């Protein structure tokens, strides 16, 4: 569907995924200009970072800069209805509608939605009363998963740990808390392009969320990832399509909920009576760190065409081609991630062999060519290779090109599928 038009593109967000999207879009000669709200220290070298005071201001800036396509990857702005506001202003938008964004923004809404669809997911107990929650865990079997404050997901192994998490959650908010049994299995992140009743699956990804080697420590947004995670039969992929994505889109359509963007399903594969079954853990309604920067290097087709076809609701016109290579991403994080903020640190970056991979700048600031850390997941080392082992070796070689005080990264990304005996 390639056209010869020129496009001014606005990307809403300020993390590694926005840098990854921009880095790829910049390679398309039809992209006339890139703008970011707010962007980060890396994106300012790829386009123009705009000062955005509030979400209504973004619409004003988009009109001023004559934006043709907006890509929204910040949940907050999707929930506030930025998609609808930009579309009303005549701008194409790659992003979920306000109503669809509730699938990520509200754990309570998502669980009720999934139950109504008949999608396999963990059983759950929901309450906005601390006493009820404490009473429930007294009789529950551990480990448990506690989803609180609509963002924090904790895997807990002891009652004392659960009590502390629940008490802290109810001190901060009256939002309902979800308590589920922990589902043991092989986890996958499955990203789909959604255009209302149509969808296309992108390569499967495996996100290593726990902070420490061997999948220990607290949950994070992702310490590393591999793609494609194609270790399963076509039959399992069909189950994921037919038992998770199709029922979801059918209900969205029945509820008159528009959706033109990305839907990411976090799935756990469980063996039941000798048969592999996908269970849904969570939904996200946008590109996610770290999946985005792991999948994009596999895309040989135009990212601009992908976004345009999705935003126009014309996925049928899209022909996607993916590389046969493997990709591994490793998050280089600041000392106190993810529990608290860390002091800013100056980054020192050595040259990278781009035949082996590249770096994605995440939570960084830049002043006169000097980069500083500004958050938890600072930089992502991306390795490519003809095998997963080669991609792994390249990712860790690239990770060693970055230096800042307190830098930490997991050294076992891929251990679940590679023969890394010291971590298994």
UniProtKB/Swiss-Prot annotation:
It catalyses: 5-phospho-beta-D-ribosylamine + glycine + ATP = N(1)-(5-phospho-beta-D-ribosyl)glycinamide + ADP + phosphate + H(+). Pfam families: GARS_A, GARS_C, GARS_N. It is an enzyme of class 6 (ligase). One of its GO terms (biological process) is 'de novo' IMP biosynthetic process. Pathway: Purine metabolism; IMP biosynthesis via de novo pathway; N(1)-(5-phospho-D-ribosyl)glycinamide from 5-phospho-alpha-D-ribose 1-diphosphate: step 2/2. ATP binds at residues 137-189. Residues 111-312 form the ATP-grasp domain. Disulfide bonds: none annotated. Its EC number is 6.3.4.13. Keywords: ATP-binding, Ligase, Nucleotide-binding, Purine biosynthesis. One of its GO terms (molecular function) is phosphoribosylamine-glycine ligase activity. InterPro entries: ATP-grasp, ATP_grasp_subdomain_1, PreATP-grasp_dom_sf, PRibGlycinamid_synth_ATP-grasp, PRibGlycinamide_synth, PRibGlycinamide_synth_C-dom, PRibGlycinamide_synth_C_sf, PRibGlycinamide_synth_N. Gene3D superfamilies: 3.40.50.20, ATP-grasp fold, A domain (3.30.1490.20), ATP-grasp fold, B domain (3.30.470.20), Phosphoribosylglycinamide synthetase, C-terminal domain (3.90.600.10). Belongs to the GARS family. NCBIfam families: purD. This is Phosphoribosylamine--glycine ligase. It comes from Helicobacter pylori (strain ATCC 700392 / 26695).
């Amino acid at each position: 569907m390639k056209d010869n038009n020129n496009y001014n593109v606005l990307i809403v967000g300020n993390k590694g995924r926005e840098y990854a999207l921009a880095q790829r879009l910049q390679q398309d000669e039809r992209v006339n200009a890139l703008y970011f709200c707010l962007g980060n220290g890396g994106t300012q070298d790829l386009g123009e970072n705009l000062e955005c005071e509030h979400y209504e201001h973004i619409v004003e800036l988009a009109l001023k800069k004559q934006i043709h396509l907006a890509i929204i990857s910040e949940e907050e702005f999707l929930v506030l209805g930025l998609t609808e506001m930009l579309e009303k202003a005549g701008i194409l938008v790659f992003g979920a509608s306000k109503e669809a964004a509730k699938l990520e923004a509200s754990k309570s809404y998502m669980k009720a939605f999934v139950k109504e669809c008949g999608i396999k997911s963990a059983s759950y107990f929901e309450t906005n009363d601390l006493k009820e929650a404490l009473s429930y865990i007294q009789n529950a079997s551990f480990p448990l998963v506690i989803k609180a404050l609509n963002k924090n997901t904790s895997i807990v192994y002891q009652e004392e740990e659960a009590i502390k998490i629940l008490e802290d959650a109810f001190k901060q908010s009256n939002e309902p808390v979800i308590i589920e049994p922990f589902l043991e299995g092989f986890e996958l992140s499955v990203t789909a392009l959604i255009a209302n009743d149509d969808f296309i699956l992108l390569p499967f990804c495996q996100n290593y969320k726990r902070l420490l080697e061997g999948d220990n420590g607290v949950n994070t947004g992702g310490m590393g990832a591999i793609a494609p995670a194609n270790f399963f039969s076509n039959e399992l992929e069909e189950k994921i399509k037919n038992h998770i994505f199709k029922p979801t889109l059918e209900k969205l359509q029945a509820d008159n909920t528009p959706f033109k963007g990305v839907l990411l399903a976090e799935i756990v594969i469980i063996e039941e009576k000798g048969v592999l079954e996908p269970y849904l853990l969570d939904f996200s309604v946008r590109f996610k760190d770290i999946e985005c920067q792991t999948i994009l290097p596999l895309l040989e087709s135009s990212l601009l065409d992908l976004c345009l076809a999705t935003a126009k609701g014309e996925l049928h016109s899209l022909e996607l081609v993916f590389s046969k290579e493997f990709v591994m991403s490793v998050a280089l994080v600041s000392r106190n991630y993810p529990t608290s903020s860390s002091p800013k640190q100056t980054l020192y970056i050595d040259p990278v062999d781009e035949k082996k991979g590249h770096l994605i700048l995440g939570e960084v600031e830049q002043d006169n060519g000097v980069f500083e850390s500004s958050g938890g997941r600072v930089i992502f080392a991306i390795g490519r290779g003809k095998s997963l082992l080669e991609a792994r070796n390249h990712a860790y070689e690239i990770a060693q090109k970055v230096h800042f005080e307190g830098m930490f990264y997991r050294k076992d990304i891929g251990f679940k599928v590679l023969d890394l005996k010291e971590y298994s």
